[in-house]
Amino acid sequence: MIIDLDTLDPANLPAEVAVSAVSMAELATGPHATNDVDERARRQDRLQRAEAAFDPLPFDSDSARAYGRVYASVAAAGREARGARAVDLLIAATACAAGLPLSTRNGTNFEALEGLVDIVVV
């Protein structure tokens, strides 16, 4: 959701927003994931604005423990829990450990987490 933050209707967002360090790491890859100079500049600008606006929630030992529960829930549902999906699950584990809802544009990425994380599709 953070990549779309400036295009979302503020009325659909919570009053307070937190960002995980894992989300910031994902955002940091953006400028390096394109060869288009203009797109790289847009992504770098987005990264710098996010870095200035947020003090990210760390992926700490509580998050690591929560990741085990998140992974088990997803795997038990027969969904992919490794590879590129693992990043989404690390973000979900951070929200789980912090007791915070996870707002996302891609609710299907977080299916099978009922009871662990409140997923809010915006």
List each language-model region with its residue ranges:
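Short, well-structured N-terminal submotif of metal-dependent ribonuclease cores
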Residues: 1-48
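Generic detector of contiguous secondary-structure segments
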Residues: 7-9, 47-62
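Short, hinge-like loop/turn segments at secondary-structure boundaries
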Residues: 34-38, 75, 120-122
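Alpha-helix capping/helix-boundary segments
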Residues: 1, 63, 108-109
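Active-site neighborhoods of divalent-metal-dependent phosphate/nucleic-acid chemistry enzymes
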Residues: 31, 55-101
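Acidic, PIN/NYN-like endoribonuclease modules and their adjacent C-terminal/linker elements
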Residues: 92-122
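Histidine- and aromatic-rich ligand-binding microenvironments
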Residues: 20, 84-85, 106
